[in-house]
Amino acid sequence: GLQEFQFEYPFVIQGIAGCELHSGKAIQSFLRAGFEGLDFVSIENHSCVPEPEGGSEAQWFCVFITQYQGILAIIDRLLSKTCPRYLLGVLDAGKAELHRQVKPEAWLSSGPTPGPGRLLLVCHVSGFYPKPVRVMWMRGEQEQPGTQQGNIILNADWTWYLRVTLDVAAGEAAGLSCRVKHSSLGDQDIILYWGHPMYIGLIFVAIIVPSLILLICLALWFWRRWSYQTVL
């Protein structure tokens, strides 16, 4: 076959095929082949078209390949149906990914002690998507200098995690807060105040739990007394 076209070994063949989506959702498919760095042939509308740079070899090749209509039919099906369907699927998936919004979760902790009389405040933000996020340690409405931001790390579910720290004197930690800004939150920023969860927990343990126990004991005492009087 190759001897008929007077191709000399070695030789280089290049090819490109695909489909493009134009304005108005018109899809144009293409297949072009090159030989020794020059345009050789292209497949258009179920037919082989020789390129001028291909010369007589390109013309003879198109005559040769036209004898095999089954091959041209397969190429045409791939270009006109399979490729556009795949392209539209990729575009739909991309649009869904671009519009994906996942709200972050945030919590506070303390890190290793930086030194005597100092605290390392840590603000964790996880599970957010897309990646851009802003996390700040604040006092009132003022962002605190010295805030250190770690690398944004990819979670197993393709959301993101970020750790932001602040080194402060132990006596200056009260009144600090961590503010999280993310597109999924709109104008409803997450604000966590340092120390508040601990105080709430202490109040719950010291007041609410004993009160509940006392109420249960009183209820049992009244119930037993009422039962005893009923028997008498």
Swiss-Prot record:
<dbReference type="Pfam" id="PF16497">
    <property type="entry name" value="MHC_I_3"/>
</dbReference>
<dbReference type="InterPro" id="IPR037055">
    <property type="entry name" value="MHC_I-like_Ag-recog_sf"/>
</dbReference>
<feature type="disulfide bond">
    <location>
        <begin position="123"/>
        <end position="178"/>
    </location>
</feature>
<feature type="disulfide bond">
    <location>
        <begin position="48"/>
        <end position="62"/>
    </location>
</feature>
<dbReference type="GO" id="GO:0071723">
    <property type="term" value="F:lipopeptide binding"/>
</dbReference>
<dbReference type="GO" id="GO:0048006">
    <property type="term" value="P:antigen processing and presentation, endogenous lipid antigen via MHC class Ib"/>
</dbReference>
<dbReference type="GO" id="GO:0005615">
    <property type="term" value="C:extracellular space"/>
</dbReference>
<feature type="domain" description="Ig-like">
    <location>
        <begin position="84"/>
        <end position="194"/>
    </location>
</feature>
<feature type="topological domain" description="Cytoplasmic">
    <location>
        <begin position="223"/>
        <end position="232"/>
    </location>
</feature>
<dbReference type="Pfam" id="PF07654">
    <property type="entry name" value="C1-set"/>
</dbReference>
<dbReference type="InterPro" id="IPR003597">
    <property type="entry name" value="Ig_C1-set"/>
</dbReference>
<keyword id="KW-0458">Lysosome</keyword>
<dbReference type="InterPro" id="IPR011162">
    <property type="entry name" value="MHC_I/II-like_Ag-recog"/>
</dbReference>
<protein>
    <recommendedName>
        <fullName>T-cell surface glycoprotein CD1b-3</fullName>
    </recommendedName>
</protein>
<dbReference type="GO" id="GO:0030883">
    <property type="term" value="F:endogenous lipid antigen binding"/>
</dbReference>
<dbReference type="GO" id="GO:0009897">
    <property type="term" value="C:external side of plasma membrane"/>
</dbReference>
<feature type="disulfide bond">
    <location>
        <begin position="19"/>
        <end position="83"/>
    </location>
</feature>
<dbReference type="GO" id="GO:0030884">
    <property type="term" value="F:exogenous lipid antigen binding"/>
</dbReference>
<dbReference type="GO" id="GO:0010008">
    <property type="term" value="C:endosome membrane"/>
</dbReference>
<keyword id="KW-0325">Glycoprotein</keyword>
<comment type="function">
    <text>Antigen-presenting protein that binds self and non-self lipid and glycolipid antigens and presents them to T-cell receptors on natural killer T-cells.</text>
</comment>
<keyword id="KW-1064">Adaptive immunity</keyword>
<dbReference type="GO" id="GO:0002250">
    <property type="term" value="P:adaptive immune response"/>
</dbReference>
<feature type="topological domain" description="Extracellular">
    <location>
        <begin position="1"/>
        <end position="201"/>
    </location>
</feature>
<dbReference type="GO" id="GO:0005765">
    <property type="term" value="C:lysosomal membrane"/>
</dbReference>
<dbReference type="InterPro" id="IPR050208">
    <property type="entry name" value="MHC_class-I_related"/>
</dbReference>
<dbReference type="GO" id="GO:0048007">
    <property type="term" value="P:antigen processing and presentation, exogenous lipid antigen via MHC class Ib"/>
</dbReference>
<dbReference type="InterPro" id="IPR013783">
    <property type="entry name" value="Ig-like_fold"/>
</dbReference>
<keyword id="KW-1003">Cell membrane</keyword>
<dbReference type="InterPro" id="IPR011161">
    <property type="entry name" value="MHC_I-like_Ag-recog"/>
</dbReference>
<keyword id="KW-1015">Disulfide bond</keyword>
<keyword id="KW-0393">Immunoglobulin domain</keyword>
<comment type="subunit">
    <text>Heterodimer with B2M (beta-2-microglobulin). Interacts with saposin C.</text>
</comment>
<keyword id="KW-0391">Immunity</keyword>
<dbReference type="GO" id="GO:0001916">
    <property type="term" value="P:positive regulation of T cell mediated cytotoxicity"/>
</dbReference>
<keyword id="KW-0967">Endosome</keyword>
<feature type="transmembrane region" description="Helical">
    <location>
        <begin position="202"/>
        <end position="222"/>
    </location>
</feature>
<dbReference type="InterPro" id="IPR036179">
    <property type="entry name" value="Ig-like_dom_sf"/>
</dbReference>
<feature type="glycosylation site" description="N-linked (GlcNAc...) asparagine">
    <location>
        <position position="45"/>
    </location>
</feature>
<keyword id="KW-1133">Transmembrane helix</keyword>
<dbReference type="InterPro" id="IPR007110">
    <property type="entry name" value="Ig-like_dom"/>
</dbReference>
<keyword id="KW-0472">Membrane</keyword>
